[in-house]
């Protein structure tokens, strides 16, 4: 399929998408909010007073939802390589999480072992080739996991986008060695043809 036809199909699906319409009606910045909401409704991940980091935050759907759930208490830091409009009670870092100086800026904001929850919806720019895209995506997951291991408090939780493919089983195994509970979720708002799923790891063990 040509890129033009593929783009047209995506646009048509986007405008017909029930979650796009729902997000617009409810004032959310993106349909992705319903992926987090579905998981949070089942797992009660986000509570007032928490310290939360949201990686790959733009345009801000997940951050917006987390901010609402935290009710103005706690600390919420969002980071993305793309700009994001300001949200109440949110500290935003504009930068590439893969770069050391950006990572250090984030670390400087949050004392070590005080992080309650790491959220990551990071994904690379997709080329359409799984051989290229999956390794790039898994690298971002590995970086998020490394950050979580350094910053989460005992009992802390992590929710990260992860893609089926090379390295998937190894990362799940690694998570199970560090957390009390690890499950894979495919929210209803995640498009069925997408290889994305979400790894939920609860109860971090130091």
Curated annotation (Swiss-Prot):
Please name one Pfam family that this protein belongs to. FtsJ
Give this protein's Gene Ontology molecular function annotations: rRNA (uridine-2'-O-)-methyltransferase activity
The source's domain of life comes to Bacteria
What keywords are assigned to this protein?
Answer: Cytoplasm, Methyltransferase, rRNA processing, S-adenosyl-L-methionine, Transferase
The listed locations are: Cytoplasm
Q: Which InterPro entries match?
A: RNA_methyltr_RlmE (IPR050082), RNA_MeTrfase_FtsJ_dom (IPR002877), rRNA-MeTfrase_E (IPR015507), SAM-dependent_MTases_sf (IPR029063)
This entry's Enzyme Commission designation comes to 2.1.1.166
- Which top EC class is named for this enzyme in its record? transferase
Instruction: Write the signal peptide boundaries.
Output: none
* Location (main, coarse): cytoplasm
Electron transport: is it a keyword of this entry?
Answer: no
GO CC annotation: what is one?
cytoplasm
Residues forming the catalytic site: 161
Q: What's its catalytic activity? A: uridine(2552) in 23S rRNA + S-adenosyl-L-methionine = 2'-O-methyluridine(2552) in 23S rRNA + S-adenosyl-L-homocysteine + H(+)
Binding positions (S-adenosyl-L-methionine): 60, 62, 80, 96, 121
Task: Give the matching HAMAP family.
Answer: RNA_methyltr_E
Which protein family is named in the record?
Belongs to the class I-like SAM-binding methyltransferase superfamily. RNA methyltransferase RlmE family.
What the protein does comes down to: Specifically methylates the uridine in position 2552 of 23S rRNA at the 2'-O position of the ribose in the fully assembled 50S ribosomal subunit.
Which named protein is this? Ribosomal RNA large subunit methyltransferase E
